[in-house]
Amino acid sequence: MNFQEFKHKYGYDAATKMMQQYLDIKFAHLDCLLLFRMGDFYEMFYEDAVLASGVLGIALTKRGKNGDEEVPMCGVPYHALENYLTKLIEENYKVAICDQLETPEEAKNRGGYKAVVNRNVTRIITPGTVIEENLITTAEPNYLASLVVPKNKDTAALCYADLSTSTIFVVNVPELEILNELARLKPREILLSEHLRSSDLASNISKQLNFRITYQVDSFFAVNKCEKIILDFYKMKDIKGVGEISNSQICAIGSILEYLTLTQKENIPNLPKPKIIDFHSYMTIDFSTRRNLEIVTNSCGGNKGSLLSTLNHTVTKQGGRLLYNFLSSPLTDTHKINQRLNITEFFHSNLDITAKVRELLKKTSDIERCLTRITMNRGSGRDLLSIKYTLETANSIKEIFFDNYGFELPSFIEKIVKPLIRNDELYNLIEESICEDAPNNLNDGGVIKHSYHPKVLQLHDLINNGKLHIEKLKDQYKKETGIDSLKISHNNVIGLFIDITAKNANKINDPKFIHRQTTVNSVRYTTAELQKLESDLVNAKTLVVSLEKELYEDICKRVTKQSDYLRILASSLSGIDVFCNFAYIASENDYTRPEFTDDLSFDIVKGRHPVVEEALNKERKSFVHNDCHLSEAERIWLITGPNMAGKSTFMRQNAIIAIIAQIGSFVPAKSARIGMVDKIFSRIGAADDLIKGQSTFMAEMLETSAILAQSTKNSLIILDEVGRGTSTYDGVSIAWSVLEYIHDKLKCRCLFATHYHELTIMDNFLPAMQNYTIAIEESGKDILFLHNIIAGAADRSYGIHVAALAGLPASVINRAEQILLKFEKNAAGKGKNILSTESNNLSLFAIESPKLQNSKLEEKFKTIDPDKLSPKEALELLYQLKSNFIKQ
């Protein structure tokens, strides 16, 4: 829609000047909800009002007319804006904040009483650009990402930034891994080029991952333009100052910086240069595996029951974010993993230090986000106080280490403790300038200490002692004039004035006394001093707030110069918090340090699933531990056994142990020897992808296909029930061939659970595969699941027993047992296994499907025509059927 069409639609020419101003600004921000400041409210009009009233649950009213139609309107109080913004951001809306740039009085002075207050958009808030604490509802990073996919190349460039913590990264991502990488980062907003709008990639990002996409014209990502943006932003002359980056990475970085500049207007973020990430430096975990293993969220998208919720006993917000990043990105460099494990072991071996440090960490603040708000002019005195208190506490934490170890601290601990040394210059600046009870809002005043600046002291003295100053001036004038009856009074017409009786008027000879008014009984004067005092008294509150703002801005600039120091300090505190957390969890839950090898070992003794164990502990139940011994010689475990016996839990727990080990934590096991895992794939269950029109079987086959295509020798594959959802023969065939492919081609570690017992014979010709099953105890028809993994193969799945536990009607259970018995007799007569190893050309379809015989009741029903029965005959037949049913 062009501007002329827009003007016609909204009746621009007939609108008031204020509404024309609104429409001008709205046209420039058509992709945003426009919140338009009018006095004490932010108002919305037309479609914005209708949409916002529904989302926010506020009343929809009217304001004026557009032709014959009333204009919808709704509004929110300015002081409650952030509460409403939270809801809009949660719903992924883009919001433009239009503020008044002058007061109504200033507008009148500028253009008369009909003048419209100047307004303009001061900020655009999007899900990926929020920095306010109450707008960021989770402890995870709040990433804005830009994805650049060059044509005819198999690698994309991804830049991602968390504005709230002033961090920015760039990485080259293999094309096949784009969705997996986005699933790792979970960005709140992704910038994409317009030409990708109809692509499968955009569709998958939007529908499968459910991430917000903001499309930009193709020129937004032009390499020459983006390079200039980077150079200007970082005040560099050569792009090599960022590092060795490709043209695609230049486009990704430049587009993010441009978007941040456009949305933040004058408040340009103080971002460091992008950190270049090596894609292969962390474990690949695809989208489905993250969901199946419930690493950082549960299957419903919440936190409860996730691995993160179990492991997260951090005591700071920045520590929680770092743990989230650790779990999202386990390392693949064993040297770096062992460096982390060394730190964890130090805290685990010094639990007294750990306990003291954790108590002090609770007193620190999220100074990363405090610093961002300060540098972007959205901070408060409390943010500065938070930094001061954290500096003080960090120094106390440092002293704990040196009091216990002196100069004998291990080098890897000294490295993370060294940044805790207090920056006295910064500490003293805040200590001397900011009031301990500073309000959040600068407009309330009381942020700057009176003693920090003489003018502040003077103004507060005026505010608090105005009457005293008037009395002092009165006494001075009495002495100068010799008039003891001289008074200083006030009225609403002439303000403060010197009042003397008429008979004393002849004593006023000094020209500094300026005549103001004569009455019957008195003469009134003023002086330049009195006028200044009156002006100062009237304007003192306004002046002190204005002066405090100036001083506050100067203090913030000086604090911003210490950004590098504060970021290093924040990083140190968050790291200490995470490693103390690892030590705490290990001591509370009997975790042990894993050992890393250079082979395909995966030797876990008495391993446990941490999330399930935590849930059982709350019920005062014990978790049944299990071993897992994968190696070069025994890479594949084929696991058979009953439903509900714990196969899926066992497989998940081993994948989770690998993840926990490679983030640098101790693991829930008696011992663990692990060859580094570069990728984990888990296909355990799948829901129908109704959006894409895919069945459960199709979804599972797509996942399995991706696993086989992307796995390497160092990968760990977890597969459960491959081949289900189709005919038995098809399913067995697929599962068989997948096992062969993993064994012969990929040669990686794999846990493979199945109900196809025919597969158990494959250990005869797949030397690196072994059969394992779940131990049970049978007593008559009763079955006890022991949850122990033992060598061997199961010959039954006990599905009917599980169905009975689920509460299926007894008649259904009895009928199922009858049918199962017929199947088993039929199978016994034709050979136990559907598959045979006698021939390389396996006869998969040699056995016909058993046919079920109809019961006598079913045969009887076939002979009945209800329309030909009289009521009496129908009743007699009902009794007869009941009698036969009881006999059956």
From Swiss-Prot:
Q: What is the name listed in the Swiss-Prot or TrEMBL entry for this protein?
A: DNA mismatch repair protein MutS
Nucleus among the record's keywords?
A: no
Q: Which UniProt keywords apply?
A: ATP-binding, DNA damage, DNA repair, DNA-binding, Nucleotide-binding
Q: What does this protein do?
A: This protein is involved in the repair of mismatches in DNA. It is possible that it carries out the mismatch recognition step. This protein has a weak ATPase activity.
Claim: Ribonucleoprotein is one of the keywords in the record: no
GO annotation terms (biological process): mismatch repair
Coiled-coil stretches, from where to where?
none
Residues that bind ATP: G641, P642, N643, M644, A645, G646, K647, S648
Q: Which domain of life is it from?
A: Bacteria
The record ties this protein, via Gene3D superfamilies, to: 1.10.1420.10, 6.10.140.430, DNA repair protein MutS, domain I, MutS, connector domain, P-loop containing nucleotide triphosphate hydrolases
Q: What is stated as this protein's family in its record?
A: Belongs to the DNA mismatch repair MutS family.
- A Pfam cross-reference name: MutS_IV
Q: Which GO terms describe its molecular function?
A: ATP binding; ATP-dependent DNA damage sensor activity; damaged DNA binding; mismatched DNA binding
Q: What is the lineage of its organism?
A: Bacteria, Pseudomonadati, Pseudomonadota, Alphaproteobacteria, Rickettsiales
What PROSITE patterns is this protein classified in? Answer: DNA_MISMATCH_REPAIR_2
What InterPro entries does the database record attribute to this sequence?
Answer: DNA_mismatch_repair_MutS, DNA_mismatch_repair_MutS-lik_N, DNA_mismatch_repair_MutS/MSH, DNA_mismatch_repair_MutS_C, DNA_mismatch_repair_MutS_clamp, DNA_mismatch_repair_MutS_core, DNA_mismatch_repair_MutS_N, DNA_mismatch_repair_MutS_sf
- The gene for this chain is mutS
